[in-house]
Amino acid sequence: MSALVYFSSSSENTHRFMQRLGLPATRIPLNERERIQVDEPYILVVPSYGGGGMAGAVPRQVIRFLNDEHNRARIRGVIASGNRNFGDAWGCAGDVIAQKCGVPWLYRFELMGTQRDIDNVRKGVNEFWQQSPRSA
């Protein structure tokens, strides 16, 4: 497994961001019947759903992944994507997950992100793991 876990819908925006990021990552399956377990601490990268409100912002697949105690115990931070058209609620899945899991919300980016987002996340992830213990 890897230190980054992500979910991407069929739009593939988050997947394209992760490909451009170029860091090892594990994808939460789109098919809700497929399950994965993560055996090391990780940062979760997640898109926000819905029309800008908190209800429905976190994808069902991510909820199911985090409802697994084994996976939830290893989350160390969250990065969220979203759409600025949602106003103050853009990227709010990150806020919901950070609050419910008691981890920091590290960054948010719009849609597929910009090169600046890629650079910021790459640098931030490296700094985060240097400062944070990886022990489960």
From Swiss-Prot:
GO terms (BP aspect): protein modification process
Coiled-coil residue windows: none
Disulfide-bonded cysteines: none
An MF annotation (GO) of this entry: FMN binding
Classification via InterPro entries: Flavoprotein-like_sf, RNR_Ib_NrdI_bac, RNR_NrdI
NCBIfam families assigned: nrdI (TIGR00333)
PANTHER family named among the record's database cross-references: PROTEIN NRDI (PTHR37297:SF1)
Family to which the UniProt record says this protein belongs: Belongs to the NrdI family.
Function, in words: Probably involved in ribonucleotide reductase function.
Protein name: Protein NrdI
Organism per entry: Salmonella typhi
